[in-house]
Every structure is written in structure tokens, then in C-alpha cells.
């Protein structure tokens, strides 16, 4: 099996961190999103929506979407329990995964794709043309900054995002912070709990994927 990715993009980063934490080795194939390689026919045969990452199994089947890929490997190798162990933990981790995606990642994506010249006529991750809407960029920035305050409040009362144990929610938040910096949404002195949490996570093995 192999994973097609663009190493520095946020969704591939989530899978990289997850697999590093699980100590799972997989072959990676780089797809140059900047040059538009993901919109060429060869890659569209793998993922018609053009997004990365995409996991191609040995039988030829393809799993796209970063969280779906992580779920696949989690089913193969459950430990360490990054999606929670007990029913309660699983529910809480899933809740925070969704919150981070909806309240954090999505607004940053809206901001970037509706403001960057690189995404002109490509405001959504799809090979078909979609015009940018500048107002969505402004709203995305506002919502992402609001989320910094919300997650800082959460971390002021909890060691990790989902509670006492490191989980996929922490991976998602760590990637969110890197992605948010692309549009200048960065924690300030008002987000001390978030800043301290990030310092702790940066020492973990999975965070080292950002060094390559």
C-alpha cells in the first residue's frame, strides 16, 4: 500500500502524525499540489476530487480523507488508543475532532482559499472551477481567531484536548495551529494555556514530522 500526499499540507500532516505516534511505516508518494499535479489525469484516477492524502491499498482500492485513513490504520493497530479506549473516551475524542475541524480547520480553509492568489478559481478542493468570495475569507479569519479563545479555555482545565490522555484530537489541534499560521491566525499572550500545551506536544515523536 502507499499514501499519496503533499507533505506540507494540513491533511497529510494529520496522517503523518497519527502514523508516527502509532509507529506505523508506510510508503509515501509525493504529489506536487503547487504545480497542479493533483489535478492531472493520472492522480484524478486515484482520487477524482483531487485532494490529498489518498491511501491506495494493495488490492487497488482507495481511501481518501485524512480521518478515514487514520481510522483504517487504527482498526489494524488499535494501540495506542488515539481515538479513545472506553466508550466515554471515544465519544469525547470524536466530539473534539469534529469541533476542531468545523470551528477551526474549516474557517482557516475558507480564509486561505478565498484570499490566496494560488487558489484563484479553486476556492473549494475540487478540480472544477469555483470562484473566490472575499467575504468568506474575512469571516474565516474571524472564526478561526474566535476558536483560539475557545480551545484555550478548554486547555486551561484539561491536560490534553480530550482530557487526561493524548489523542487524535491533540493531533488535529496541533495541525490546525500550523495551518492557521498560514493566514496569520496565531496564539497571543491571551492564549497561555494553548501556548503551554503546544510546547508539550512539540516534544512528542509525532510532532517531528514538521521537521521534514
Please give the residue ranges for each predicted region:
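GST-like domain detector, emphasizing the conserved glutathione-binding G-site
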Residues: 1-131
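A local structural micro-motif
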Residues: 27, 163, 188, 209-210
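Phosphate-coordinating loops and pocket residues in cytosolic domains that bind phosphorylated ligands
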Residues: 45, 203, 212
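Residues at helix-coil transition
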Residues: 74, 78, 156, 202-203
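GST-like fold's C-terminal all-alpha helical module
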Residues: 102-200
Amino acid at each position: 500500500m502507499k499514501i499519496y500526499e503533499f507533505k506540507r499540507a494540513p491533511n497529510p500532516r494529520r496522517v503523518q502524525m497519527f502514523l508516527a505516534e502509532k509507529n506505523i511505516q508506510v510508503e509515501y508518494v509525493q504529489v506536487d499540489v503547487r504545480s497542479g499535479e493533483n489535478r492531472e489525469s493520472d492522480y484524478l484516477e486515484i482520487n477524482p476530487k483531487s485532494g490529498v492524502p489518498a491511501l491506495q491499498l494493495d488490492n487497488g482500492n482507495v481511501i481518501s480523507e485524512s480521518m478515514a485513513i487514520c481510522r483504517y490504520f487504527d482498526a489494524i493497530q488499535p494501540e495506542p488508543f488515539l481515538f479513545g479506549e472506553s466508550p466515554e473516551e471515544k465519544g469525547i475524542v470524536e466530539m473534539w475532532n469534529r469541533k476542531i475541524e468545523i470551528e477551526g480547520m474549516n474557517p482557516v480553509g475558507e480564509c486561505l482559499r478565498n484570499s490566496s492568489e494560488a487558489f484563484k478559481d479553486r476556492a473549494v478542493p475540487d478540480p472544477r472551477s469555483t470562484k473566490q468570495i472575499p467575504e468568506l475569507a474575512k469571516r474565516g479569519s474571524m472564526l478561526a481567531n474566535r476558536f483560539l479563545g475557545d480551545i484555550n479555555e478548554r486547555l486551561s482545565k484539561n491536560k490534553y484536548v480530550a482530557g487526561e490522555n493524548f489523542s487524535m484530537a491533540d493531533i488535529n489541534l496541533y495541525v490546525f495551529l500550523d495551518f492557521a499560521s498560514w493566514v496569520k491566525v496565531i496564539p497571543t499572550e491571551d492564549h497561555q494555556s494553548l501556548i503551554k500545551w503546544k510546547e508539550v506536544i512539540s516534544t512528542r515523536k509525532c510532532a517531528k514530522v514538521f521537521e521534514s
